[in-house]
């Protein structure tokens, strides 16, 4: 089998595609993959590092307001579609899978024009612009959230989850909190605002530090590499022995597997990882995303009893501390939330999406 994967712009579009490839290789080791991404996107570094063949296209996103730049965007898109057609004809895939981002729009649309089966995957509860555009011509559509079902043609959309969940759930963790000077016997709260960090979360942590120092649970704060020194400079109370402040964590899935509770943004990949592992969570959605989709992602977990949510305007040291205490000092609440998170998580998401791809090829 030969498959073209395309998704770009953010890790939330890229990692599900790579996780899917990992699952498919377990079922069909001889599968050939080609990843088509954008020239300037992070996928141009992430994908080649995995050893997967990679082709580049030049695309850019639309401006939300009227702009002459949108004329250039359309021109680049049409050129990218033409280039994508050549790539597709040369590779001759059985199916083309798009996981979102503007580059996948050009690639999947080109495949549709060439009458090649296409599958798109929507990771968020609010469908992205690209996937909405592609949905009419797609052979099959997989979504991660029930809330996304109504946004696509009902005869070809199915809930499959996020392949990243299956990848994380299968990891055997060798991590020990002792590696950073903490105990494996105490509950541990991980506060993580994403790979670049989240200033509002960092500020709330600074505000809560004096009280965190007094708790009998452990607190690990990941600031983001560029924000680490700033956080240390702004502390008025130094961390106690139960608190660690780190710029980043390289082996995040292994650390997550040993985490008692987490404070996190509500991006699709984070949600997939949290639910796959059944981690009680305090979600702080970013309000600076398209369609406010992180709030809707978070609300789906809150409605299921799998998470707490603090909106960014309501975030403070006190609010963060109260939420953390409610999870880490109340075993029954934590246990219930763990069970509900696992119920929400789809731990065989990669297998489900693979089955959908086979259905698309068979049509």
Swiss-Prot record:
EC main group: transferase
Q: Which InterPro entries match?
A: GlcNAc_MurG, Glyco_trans_28_C, GlycoTrans_28_N
A cellular component term from Gene Ontology for this protein is:
plasma membrane
Q: Which organism is it from?
A: Leuconostoc mesenteroides subsp. mesenteroides (strain ATCC 8293 / DSM 20343 / BCRC 11652 / CCM 1803 / JCM 6124 / NCDO 523 / NBRC 100496 / NCIMB 8023 / NCTC 12954 / NRRL B-1118 / 37Y)
The pathway entry for this protein reads as:
Cell wall biogenesis; peptidoglycan biosynthesis
**Has keyword Metal-binding?**
no
Instruction: Specify the protein name.
Output: UDP-N-acetylglucosamine--N-acetylmuramyl-(pentapeptide) pyrophosphoryl-undecaprenol N-acetylglucosamine transferase
Which family, according to the similarity comment? Answer: Belongs to the glycosyltransferase 28 family. MurG subfamily.
Q: Which biological process terms from the Gene Ontology are attached to this UniProt entry?
A: carbohydrate metabolic process; cell division; cell wall organization; lipid glycosylation; peptidoglycan biosynthetic process; regulation of cell shape
User: What role does it play?
Assistant: Cell wall formation. Catalyzes the transfer of a GlcNAc subunit on undecaprenyl-pyrophosphoryl-MurNAc-pentapeptide (lipid intermediate I) to form undecaprenyl-pyrophosphoryl-MurNAc-(pentapeptide)GlcNAc (lipid intermediate II).
Which reactions appear under catalytic activity for this entry?
Answer: Mur2Ac(oyl-L-Ala-gamma-D-Glu-L-Lys-D-Ala-D-Ala)-di-trans,octa-cis-undecaprenyl diphosphate + UDP-N-acetyl-alpha-D-glucosamine = beta-D-GlcNAc-(1->4)-Mur2Ac(oyl-L-Ala-gamma-D-Glu-L-Lys-D-Ala-D-Ala)-di-trans,octa-cis-undecaprenyl diphosphate + UDP + H(+)
In terms of NCBIfam families, this protein maps to: murG
The organism's taxonomy opens as: Bacteria, Bacillati, Bacillota, Bacilli, Lactobacillales
- Where mainly found? membrane
Q: In which residues is UDP-N-acetyl-alpha-D-glucosamine bound?
A: 10-12, 124, 195, 249, 294
The membrane-topology field of this record reads: Peripheral membrane protein
Query: Could you tell me one molecular function GO term of this UniProt entry?
Result: undecaprenyldiphospho-muramoylpentapeptide beta-N-acetylglucosaminyltransferase activity
